[in-house]
Amino acid sequence: MINKAILGGTFDPIHNAHINVAYEALERFNLEEVIFIPAGNPPHKINLKKTPAHIRYEMVKLAIEKETRFSISDFEIKSKSLSYTYRTLKHFKEKEPETNWYFITGEDCLSYLEHWKYIDEIFNICNFVIFSREGFKEKEEIIKKKKSILLKYRKEILFMDASILDISSTKIRNRIKEGKEVSFYMPDKVYKFILQNNLYK
């Protein structure tokens, strides 16, 4: 069976930690492909200011262009409706029903995961992978949440430690506003694109 993963996010901007997570997932889950999906209109971030979708899409495209096992999809940003994870996963599962799908997301989603739309169906469609920038060792709240989901949905959440790189898009945007250096946080072409388009000032 072919294994593929979907890595969703606003990618505002994409940075080295996103790339690191994708490479880690490739190896750990024996993936043939990781599909980056820039978010369109996620319901939990609907009131937050975001860089226009086509610009975020272009940054992701530049960041992954040299890796043949990475691809990008505009499925969410082309949609006029809210970007529900279930709808995205359903789309890819219907396209490739025989593929074993993984969905990769950040630890911050754990706090509201059980309130996601059609969460039962999501667990049926894919293997749920959560990564952390801070590591998972001895985190009591993580252990409790994992047990809770296992009992309620009879599904095991997979955890992946991405603590090697303590980077966030928010940190990058703030550093740019403050006039600080950020080139070491992202692929060179993404950094140049940000400069050329005067982003995050």
Curated annotation (Swiss-Prot):
Pathway: Cofactor biosynthesis; NAD(+) biosynthesis; deamido-NAD(+) from nicotinate D-ribonucleotide: step 1/1. One of its GO terms (biological process) is NAD biosynthetic process. The keyword Transmembrane helix does not apply. Catalyzes the reversible adenylation of nicotinate mononucleotide (NaMN) to nicotinic acid adenine dinucleotide (NaAD). It catalyses: nicotinate beta-D-ribonucleotide + ATP + H(+) = deamido-NAD(+) + diphosphate. Belongs to the NadD family. Keywords: ATP-binding, NAD, Nucleotide-binding, Nucleotidyltransferase, Pyridine nucleotide biosynthesis, Transferase. Its EC number is 2.7.7.18. This is Probable nicotinate-nucleotide adenylyltransferase.
